From Swiss-Prot:
It comes from the Bacteria. It is an enzyme of class 3 (hydrolase). Residues 359-466 are annotated as: Lon-protease-like. ATP binds at residues 100-107. This is DNA repair protein RadA. Has a putative N-terminal zinc-finger, a middle region with homology to RecA with ATPase motifs including the RadA KNRFG motif, while the C-terminus is homologous to Lon protease. A motif (RadA KNRFG motif) lies at residues 261-265. One of its GO terms (biological process) is recombinational repair. GO terms for molecular function: ATP binding; ATP hydrolysis activity; ATP-dependent DNA damage sensor activity; damaged DNA binding; zinc ion binding. SUPFAM superfamilies: P-loop containing nucleoside triphosphate hydrolases, Ribosomal protein S5 domain 2-like.
């Protein structure tokens, strides 16, 4: 091994950028606290070749067909909407990260999960680093989650928390939250990047190594930053098996759990909940809940059907176009601002509507985030409805993607979207060309471009008013 040595590098855990010395902030991605010292092997080709020599495996490789799939089967949590997102339930030995804004209802949801888990004959342990056991007990009484197989421990030291797991021997562990846990095996302050990564790594290793029937399934609560990202390095998401985002507007009781990553099922599913003073409940038909709260037809509103994973959901867009008191303003909520600006520019250019010289306000109802391109046409018709001061009929929807040329394009799952619209009682659908079939009771009106769609909207509105 002559001529070779171990040397140090300073590498960013976010972007893998290598710095010549330690710095607090990565010069490449600008993230704070992600530059760590790592040891690398440097030397001649002989050493590198020796380092690549094989080692006898402790267990042989086997054909994939000989592996028992039951080892990683799903265990239902008892919360149907969460099971929907998880692909059927929690997998033994898995680690799930649930992230969301403070106060959105993460602790309430997971206390309900622990209670349902206990009701199925299994034991759950709730570890809290943010609240005392007495505070959790008060919430449990308020929400009716007081099963005697739900164990509580207020602990922020990781080693002691692992001792609680060894003593209680649960099959489900909830850690609320991973940012409040600390370990003596890593430097840094509690909640810092180094500590969060070390705690998550230790918990993941424990879950994978645990034995039992079933093994321990863990759910970690994670905080989010101001821009909605999970607090801590992005490598945190790579350490866990499942990443879920808990979303919702504080002005609304509707909450959504959205799958971002899932090693055991589809990663694009969404579950719907309603938060009450006495707990949280599943909403199996969120579209019906939305329609119950919808007011009478007014100018500036349009309805569409989006697809969140495999679930069709109704979404309402509201727009307001008004003369400016100064420089024209733009305010967008629940819709991508760049896409909203693009749709406004298309209306300005293709339909000769002076959108750019007016104030424009766009919002979704109930705190929904419309990222599906199928909502483009509804956004455009909501703006046109507000500009012309004409209300679209209550039973009309719009589905389609808008191109820069003003053309309308079909979106995936059109049959499923139209079936959902017909089920909810809609009678007219404005869609792009090429839709040849429609469910009974739903009239499909095809528009070649955005100009034709706006004209169709005006004709439908006038006919509905007569």
């Amino acid at each position: 091994m002559a001529g070779s040595k171990i040397r140090s590098q300073y590498r960013c855990s976010e972007c893998q950028h290598v710095a010549p010395k330690w710095v607090g902030r990565c010069a490449n991605c600008g993230t704070w606290g992600t530059v760590d010292e790592v040891a690398v092997l440097a030397g001649n080709n002989k050493l590198n070749g020796a380092a690549r020599r094989s080692v006898a495996p402790t267990s042989p490789a086997v054909p994939i067909t000989s592996i028992d799939p039951g080892v990683t089967r799903h265990y239902p949590t008892g919360v149907s909407e969460l099971d929907r997102v998880l692909g059927g339930g929690l997998v033994a030995g898995s680690v799930t990260l649930l992230a969301g804004d403070p106060g959105v209802g993460k602790s309430t949801l997971l206390l309900e999960v622990a209670n349902r888990w206990a009701h199925s004959g299994k034991r759950a342990l709730y570890l809290s680093g943010e609240e005392s056991a007495g505070q959790i007990r008060l919430r449990a009484e308020r929400t009716g989650c007081t099963h005697d197989q739900v164990y509580l421990a207020a602990e922020s030291d990781l080693q002691i928390a692992l001792g609680h797991i060894d003593e209680v021997k649960p099959s489900l562990v909830v850690v609320d939250s991973v940012q409040t846990m600390s370990t003596t095996e890593a430097d840094g302050v509690t909640g810092g990047v180094t500590q969060v990564r070390a705690v998550t790594t230790s918990l993941t290793a424990y879950a994978k190594a645990a034995v039992g029937d079933p093994a321990v399934a863990m759910i970690l609560v994670g905080h989010v930053t101001k821009d909605g990202a999970i607090a801590g390095p992005r490598s945190l998401e790579h350490l866990v098996d499942v990443v879920l985002h808990f979303e919702g507007d504080r002005a609304s009781s509707l909450r959504m759990v959205r799958g971002v990553k899932n090693r055991f099922g589809a990663a694009d599913e969404v579950g719907c909940f309603q938060l009450h003073d006495n707990g949280i409940e599943c909403v199996s038909d969120p579209s019906g809940l939305f329609l119950d709260q919808r007011p009478l037809a007014v100018p500036g509103t349009a309805v569409t059907v989006t697809l969140d994973g495999k679930r069709p959901m109704i979404g309402e867009v509201q727009a307001l176009v008004s003369p400016p008191a100064g420089p024209p303003r733009r305010a967008v909520s629940g819709i991508d601002s760049a896409r909203a600006a693009m749709i406004g520019a298309v209306l300005q250019t293709r339909c000769r509507m002076p959108i750019n010289s007016n104030d424009l306000y766009l919002s979704t109802v109930g705190g929904m985030r419309l990222t599906d391109p199928s909502a483009d046409l509804a956004v455009a018709l909501a703006i046109a409805s507000a500009y012309f001061d004409i209300a679209m009929p209550m039973k009309a929807i719009a589905i389609g993607e808008v191109g820069l040329a003003g053309d309308l394009r079909r979106v995936t799952g059109m049959d499923r979207r139209l079936s959902e619209a017909a089920r909810l009682g809609f009678t007219t659908a404005v869609v792009p060309p090429g839709v040849t079939s429609a469910p009974a009771g739903l009239k499909v009106v095809a528009a070649d471009n955005i100009r034709a769609a706006v004209q169709t909207m005006r004709e439908i509105a006038i006919a509905g008013a007569q």
